[in-house]
Curated annotation (Swiss-Prot):
Keywords: Chaperone, Repeat
Organism encoding this protein: Gallus gallus
Domain of life: Eukaryota
Name of the gene this protein is made from: BAG5
Taxonomic path: Eukaryota, Metazoa, Chordata, Craniata, Vertebrata
Name of the protein in question: BAG family molecular chaperone regulator 5
A GO cellular component entry from the record: cytosol
Amino acid sequence: MDMGNQHPSIKRLHEIQKEVKEIEQQVAVFSGLSTDRDYKKLERSLTKQLFEIDSVDTEGKGDIQQARKRAAQETERLLKELEQNANHPRRLEIEAIFKEAQALVEREITPFYQGGNCVNEEFEEGIQDVVLRLTQVKTGGKVSLRKARYRTLTKVCAVQEIIESCAKRQLSLPLSNDAHPSVSKINSVMCEVNKARGTLIALLMGVSSNDTCRHLACVLTGLVADLDALDVCGRTEIRNYRKEVVEEINKLQKYLDLDEEANSTHAYDLAQNHSILKIEEIRKKLKEVNSLLLKTENASDLYLGSKAELQGLIAQLDEVSLGKNPCIREARRRAVIEVQTLITYIDLKEALGKRQMYAEQTAAEHQSHKAVWTVLGNLSQIQQEVISFDGNKTDKNYMRLEELLTKQLLALDAVDPQGDERCKAARKQAVKLAQNILYYLDMKTDEWEY
């Protein structure tokens, strides 16, 4: 319909709907909480549009009434979506884990403020645990949750990097203040760098109310300027010391732009990430090998070629760039386990086949050793089922497989090697295999996602 011939009220509704459409894009990617400033801003904007819609005069005309009703419903839908994004159980789970990390940082950050850089084991392990738990939060592919998880991980992983660098790498110096007049100044700057490191951790984790990223950037720039002004001509060891301290400052400066990076879509939308796409491409090839092996009745002829192909896939996975994203690291780890499981399946099938071929030689084996191989034969059949299984933990088949594997572990526990070293080694390997199959079954059904 020509806009020029439209009723003024319809025109006005179209204008409002256009503004609402612009707000909709912000609502879709909103990853904060209902207490955030951006939440309040979006809520006010949408409420204002509702008032604007309500004030449109319908003049009692049915078509205008219907248009106004549709516009109001769409705006109310966005208000509800905004509220749901902010109060989603998984979003609250992310926040709860982050608050634990904040409490940990507040407890452990004091040594930095005092100019030291000593990191205790509890701090390191606590941050590692937080990273792991954040990667396990299920987003269901929801953009707002993916973004919230990634933003939180970006901050916590930065803190993890900072404290790991303290724990693993001490500067080869400081030198004694008596070595050169400049050394005293460099040592005092290094002390300030340690304090800045503590401030940076506090800023990243949102536990500092006295500092800002801008102020910290100015402080770090000032420290570099102080170091540049020092006269260290002719003293290689002092020049190297200064260089090391400047490098420490540069490392801290790169973390100040993290929030902006965590906001970019390519970062948190891992479905479009190059490394994830590469992993998925490798997993697709793995499924083809898997399908061929499991569907072919006499697959022994395929074993050699399949193993070579699978080992090639492991090599390709080793080349995948992880960046600093623990979700990509976890995706690669899981893909490696999938490939290794299939290689183990082939190895066991080949070993069982050889035993059948040389049945006369195995007849004289120790009874306990034979018992272990009987269990290994059972495990091979169960492993084939586990590899094919595509259900979840509530499936009867899952519970049946879990029970079968537990029975095999109990059977191995009942085997008495009677001092036979070969039997001891075989039983140990069989137990490890059964545990790995159980772990793989659990991994397949834990509903992990990027």
